[in-house]
Every structure is written in C-alpha cells, then in structure tokens.
From Swiss-Prot:
UniProt keyword Disulfide bond present: yes
Function: Moderately activates human somatostatin receptors (SSTR) with a preferential activation of SSTR1 and SSTR4. In vivo, does not cause behavioral changes in mice within a few minutes of intracranial injection, but causes a progressive loss of movement thereafter. Four to five hours after injection, mice recover, even with the highest dose tested. Shows antinociception and antihyperalgesia activities in two mouse models of acute pain, most probably by acting outside the central nervous system.
Disulphide bridges: 62-68
UniProt main location, coarse: secreted
Location in or out of the cell: Secreted
Tissue expression summary: Expressed by the venom duct.
Lineage: Eukaryota, Metazoa, Spiralia, Lophotrochozoa, Mollusca
Prodomain positions: 23-57, 72-82
Organism: Conus rolani
Residues found modified as 4-hydroxyproline: 69-70
Residues carrying D-tryptophan: 64
Molecular function terms, GO-annotated: toxin activity
Protein name per its UniProtKB record: Consomatin Ro2
Length: 82
C-alpha cells in the first residue's frame, strides 16, 4: 500500500515539475502525449480495427439472449480429460 502511495506521489511530482519551471499546464499535458497522436490517427486506428460485415459469419450470430451457437475455439472432445 505504501509503495502505491509513493508511486502516485512521484507521478504527481513528475507531471507538475515543469509548472514550477515556468511552464503552462497545457505544455505539461502536451509533453505527456506523443506528437503523432492526432484525432485523425485515432479515428483511422478505430476504423481499421472494426470488423467489416463480410467478416461476421452466420454461425457467430446470437439471437437476442435466447440462443447462441457454441464458440469455435471450444474443444468439446476434451470433456473429463483434465
């Protein structure tokens, strides 16, 4: 518990240290964010991770909490072998 407390204190000191050197809060926040992280980059990465409709197979669809087919990664032939 003490380690977590001191880690939190040190992180706060590390983040706020530039303020004592005459920096503005905005500069401190900009210093924590990578330069290539822009809204366009975030949007592009979210779109590229989204599965397209053609990737969704019919056997993976669930009928509203009434029936879902078994997942393909489950191995039913291993029952009782553990």
């Amino acid at each position: 518990m003490q380690t977590a407390y001191w880690l939190m204190v040190m992180m706060m000191v590390w983040i706020t240290a530039p303020l004592y050197e005459g920096g503005k809060p905005n500069d401190v926040i900009r210093g924590l964010v990578p330069d290539d992280l822009t809204p366009q980059f975030i949007l592009r990465s979210l779109i590229s991770r989204r599965r397209s409709d053609k990737d969704v197979r019919a056997d993976q669809t669930c009928i509203w909490k009434t029936w879902c087919p078994p997942s393909l990664w489950r191995r039913h032939d291993r029952k009782g072998k553990d």
